[in-house]
Design a protein with these regions (language model features):
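Alpha-helical structural elements of signaling/regulatory helical domains
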Residues: 23-26, 65, 95, 109-110, ...
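Residue-level preference for long, well-ordered alpha-helices that form the structural scaffold
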Residues: 24-27, 89, 137-144
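A structural signal for well-ordered alpha-helical scaffolds and beta->alpha junctions
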Residues: 28-31, 97, 145-148
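Active-site Asp-x-Gly
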Residues: 62-103, 107-109
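Helix-rich C-terminal or lid/interface subdomains of diverse kinases
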Residues: 102-159
Length: 159
């Protein structure tokens, strides 16, 4: 069953560094120093079934808006709930995202902090598996030299 946590490995981090030629980015050193603690958090986080493929075209809404049904379950997997929150928010406008979060309710800030780090590695790993590095992963490469260190530091506060 699909699990993003399976992609958070030292081997995949090394492969990303090599394929993207970002070995010298200071964020990698900080991530590797904290890898064991982050992996421990990843093992301990509350687990659930995750959809992993939210996009509005994968949803059918009743004509009277009384119910909705998601379909296209090829990425159905296991993980922590915030992965689906991230996936939903990534495809919504800012206004729609605020409405979604209002209805969704509270989420664990430690889980979000964990996802803010792990999802970068997972997404870069998946991008590096492609023959040509995709445009949608470029912002994450840029993040290595900007906000990724801050995200790792924030996550350390939850350890």
């Amino acid at each position: 069953m699909y699990d993003e946590a399976d992609f958070f490995t030292l081997e995949n981090i090394a492969s990303i560094k090599d394929k993207t030629e970002t070995q010298d980015a200071p964020a990698w050193g900080l991530l590797e120093q904290n890898y064991a603690a982050i992996s421990d958090l990843l093992r301990k986080v509350r687990r659930t079934i995750t959809y992993n493929d939210f996009y509005y075209t994968n949803m059918v809404v009743a004509k009277d808006n009384s119910s909705a049904l998601m379909f296209d379950y090829n990425l159905l997997g296991k993980g922590y709930a915030y992965t689906d929150v991230r996936n939903v928010l990534s495809s919504l406008s800012e206004e729609a995202g605020k409405a979604f979060l209002k209805e969704y309710g509270k989420f664990d800030p430690a889980e979000k902090a964990l996802d803010d780090v792990v999802s970068v590695v997972v997404t870069l790993h998946l991008a590096c598996l492609r023959e040509n590095f995709p445009w949608w992963a470029q912002t994450l490469l840029d993040e290595l030299n900007t906000t990724f260190i801050e995200k790792i530091e924030l996550l350390r506060r939850f350890q």
